[in-house]
C-alpha cells in the first residue's frame, strides 16, 4: 500500500484501459503463467495480454519496447509471443517495436525490495537500437547492478535455472537441518549463514 501511495503521488497511473499503451515507450508484461493440472505451463494470460498489445500497436505511431517479465519456457518468445505481436500489430519486431525478455527474480516475501534492489538484470533479445535503449534505462535506474545481455532463449532458461537452483538450495538446507537435529550442538542457522 505504501509503495502504491508513493507511486500515485508521482503520477503513476493505474488503469485497465489498454488503449493507453499506444503512447508508451516501454510496456512491461508481467502476468501469471501458472501450471496446468498436467504440469504444462498455462500461457493463456500472456497470450491474451500480447494479443491486446498487438491490436493497440496496430493503431500506434510509436515504436515501443515490450519487455516480458513473466516466466515462460525457452522458445516462448520466438514461437508464441513474437508471432502474435507481429500478426496482431501488422508490424515487425526489431524494426517497428522491440521485444525483450526481462525475467524477474522476486521472492514473495521481498518483492518490493527485490524490485528496487535487484541483484542482476537479464535482458534477452536481438542487439538492436531497442536493446541499447533498455540497457541505458536500467543502467540509469540501477547504476551498480550487472546487466546480462543474451538471447531470448537463454534469458528464458536463466529464469527456470534460477528457480530450480533456489528449490535445490531449500531442499538441501532442509536435509542439513534434519542431520543437525541428530548431532548435539550442531546449529543449522550458523551453517545456513555460511553456505548462503
Please state what every model-predicted region is:
Residues 35-105:
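Rossmann-like NAD(P)(H) cofactor-binding subdomain of soluble oxidoreductases
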Residues 83-102, 106-196:
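Internal alpha-helical scaffold of NAD(P)-dependent oxidoreductase catalytic cores
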Residues 1-26, 32-41, 85-91:
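Conserved N-terminal Rossmann-fold NAD(P) cofactor-binding segment
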Residues 29-32, 70, 125-126:
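Glycine-rich, N-terminal phosphate-binding loop of Rossmann-like dinucleotide-binding domains
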Residues 1, 67, 121:
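Conserved N-terminal glycine-rich FAD pyrophosphate-binding loop of Rossmann-like flavoproteins
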Amino acid at each position: 500500500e505504501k509503495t502504491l501511495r508513493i507511486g500515485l503521488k508521482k503520477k503513476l497511473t493505474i488503469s485497465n484501459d489498454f488503449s493507453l499503451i499506444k503512447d508508451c515507450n516501454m510496456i512491461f508484461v508481467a502476468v501469471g503463467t501458472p501450471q496446468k493440472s498436467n504440469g504444462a505451463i498455462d500461457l493463456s494470460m500472456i497470450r491474451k495480454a500480447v494479443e491486446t498489445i498487438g491490436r493497440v500497436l496496430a493503431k500506434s505511431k510509436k515504436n515501443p519496447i515490450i519487455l516480458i517479465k513473466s516466466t515462460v519456457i525457452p522458445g516462448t518468445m520466438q514461437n508464441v509471443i513474437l508471432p502474435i505481436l507481429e500478426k496482431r500489430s501488422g508490424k515487425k519486431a526489431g524494426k517497428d517495436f522491440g521485444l525483450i525478455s526481462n525475467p524477474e527474480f522476486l521472492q514473495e516475501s521481498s518483492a518490493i525490495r527485490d524490485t528496487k534492489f535487484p541483484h542482476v538484470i537479464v535482458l534477452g533479445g536481438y542487439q538492436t537500437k531497442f536493446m541499447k535503449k533498455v540497457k541505458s534505462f536500467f543502467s540509469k535506474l540501477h547504476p551498480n547492478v550487472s546487466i546480462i545481455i543474451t538471447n531470448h532463449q537463454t534469458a528464458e532458461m536463466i529464469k527456470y535455472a534460477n528457480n530450480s537452483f533456489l528449490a535445490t538450495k531449500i531442499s538441501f538446507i532442509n536435509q542439513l537441518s534434519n542431520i543437525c537435529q541428530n548431532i548435539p550442538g550442531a546449529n543449522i542457522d550458523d551453517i545456513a549463514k555460511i553456505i548462503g
